[in-house]
């Protein structure tokens, strides 16, 4: 039976404040419970896409997180993101080492009052390691 995998919450922490990062196996990590995550106000559900490809004989993993927010998120450099899915898993987008996730913001100013006016944030992260979930 498939369980829902929609992203229902997103938190972030500066890479310098990511405590106790330890990779366990291929696709799991442990993070210190004292890490101070900052909750982001997002329209649920958000979208998380994880894919892989072979580039010059090396497997590269890419995670793309897309969400809408009513707040202007201008500070997008050097953050690590934690995504909670409806099935209870937490995925970690980024680590405390380079390359860091890259974020961009699209600000919507529609000509119709009933159209979407939320900012759309896209966070992209590329790594040679699988995108892990948090234990």
Model-derived regions: residue spans:
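Solvent-exposed edge beta-strands and adjacent loop segments
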Residues: 1-64, 99-113
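Generic detector of leucine side chains in alpha-helical contexts
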Residues: 18-19, 40, 48, 65, ...
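Sequence-level detector for tyrosine residue identity
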Residues: 21, 61, 81, 90-91, ...
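Oligomerization/assembly interface segments of phage tail-like spikes and tubes
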Residues: 49-72, 115-129
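Short, acidic/charged, Gly/Pro-enriched secondary-structure junctions
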Residues: 70-97
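Mixed-charge, glycine-accented linear interaction segment located at domain edges/termini
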Residues: 98-135
């Amino acid at each position: 039976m498939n369980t829902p995998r929609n992203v229902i919450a997103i938190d972030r922490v500066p890479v310098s404040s990511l405590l106790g990062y330890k990779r366990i196996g291929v696709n799991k990590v442990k993070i210190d419970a004292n890490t101070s995550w900052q909750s982001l106000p997002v329209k649920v559900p958000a979208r998380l896409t994880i894919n892989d490809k072979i580039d010059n004989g090396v497997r590269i993993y890419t995670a793309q997180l897309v969400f809408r927010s009513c707040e202007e998120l201008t500070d997008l450099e050097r953050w690590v993101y934690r995504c909670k899915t409806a099935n209870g898993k937490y995925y970690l987008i980024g680590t405390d080492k380079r390359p860091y996730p890259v974020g961009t913001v699209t600000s919507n100013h529609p000509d119709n009052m009933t159209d979407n006016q939320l900012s759309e944030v896209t966070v992209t992260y590329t790594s040679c390691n699988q995108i892990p979930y948090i234990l």
